[in-house]
Amino acid sequence: HPSYAAAVTLTEKDARVADDAGRVQRRTLVVLSLALVLGGLGVSGAVTGGGLLVAEVSGRESLAGLGQTSVVLGAAVMAVPLARLSARFGRRIGLASGYAAGVVGAALVVVGSAAPSTLVLLLGLTLFGTAVAAGLQSRFAATDLSPPARVGRDLSVVVWMTSVGAVVGPNVAQPAAATGAALGLPGVSGIFVWSGAGIVVAAVLVLLALRPDPLLLARRRRAEATGADDPPRPSLRATFAGIGASPPARLAFASVVLAHAAMVGLMVMTPLHLDHGGHGLRVVGVVISVHVAGMYLFSPLVGAAADAVGEVAVIAIGALTMAAGGVLAATAPSTASTTVGVALFLLGIGWSCCSVAGAALLTSSVPPELRPSAQGATD
């Protein structure tokens, strides 16, 4: 029967499309994961050394907090431009551009530490934050082709891979410092020599291997399914209006933003706090590694929980865990590195719950045409 034959043909075509999308999604997850291993190695090493380097170059410990502040500021300022770049040209160009800018930032950090110039150093750290923004947006790139039931798990797989580079990164601080000294630079700046090298490889990998582009493919599939052209890219005002119009999106936005603010506020001063307690780079590196392990290591379980019991429940668990870690960190003396490590581990787990579940909730709570800009605005 003609109608039956047409239905069978349509079913077979849908199956082939789904199978092709599945293969592309698996490849996308592999490429993003490998890039984040390399990028995570660089970024987490910078967390360990940024504040110490600012204090060393400026000669003022009171300015140490500006190191991580500059990185976070750079990530925040560049998040929306990178999202717009991705919306126009695809994730491949957006992410590779972010990593490339981070490499330039790492080079400026080295120049600023050698000069020495605190201003150039802070400018480099700010530009280095663009690589952080690219890493954060990678988790959203992992969901472009995800079926609705797998958004949390696909996102968390990519976040989990960050843990490999991020946990190792702080522990290469000492050999990286030796590299800096061998080059005649302030020792801590060697961390950024290693960081820049890792991010270069991440940029090249994304640029060459993230094909077909997941965002452009997802957009094309939607257009074919609906028969409609893609709507124009929304303005920043329209993006925030779209987030504000959806209660789940508002919760997701608040979860990601507030969790990140609380986490960074405590993490940024930990190396200096431990330094005041007489601990060296090795202990600082271990504590930051424990913190980063909490942030990323359990993300697959967090993503699975978000898909199974709901993102809101996981966000609530994360908020309570962060509160416990924050109280412990606030009361821990600088000599108690173990207590500080436990506090930052709890802080990391809570951040993971709020960030992974919040990002998954945001992705599912805004229309497809708003997603890249909403994701960038949230970051």
Name each region found by the language model:
Residues 50, 133-147, 353-366:
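Intracellular juxtamembrane helix-capping segments at the cytosolic ends
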Residues 37, 118-133, 339-353:
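Hydrophobic core of transmembrane alpha-helices in multi-pass small-molecule transporters
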Residues 100-115, 321-334:
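C-terminal ends and interior cores of transmembrane alpha-helices
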Residues 298, 306, 312-358:
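C-terminal transmembrane helical hairpin of 12-TM major facilitator-type secondary transporters
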Residues 78-91, 297-311:
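Helix-to-loop junctions at the C-terminal end of transmembrane segments
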Residues 125-161:
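Cytoplasmic helix-loop-helix junction between adjacent transmembrane helices
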Residues 9-26, 211-253:
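Juxtamembrane intracellular "pre-TM" segments in multi-pass secondary transporters
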Residues 173-174, 178, 196-223:
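C-terminal membrane-cytosol helix-exit motif in multi-pass small-molecule transporters
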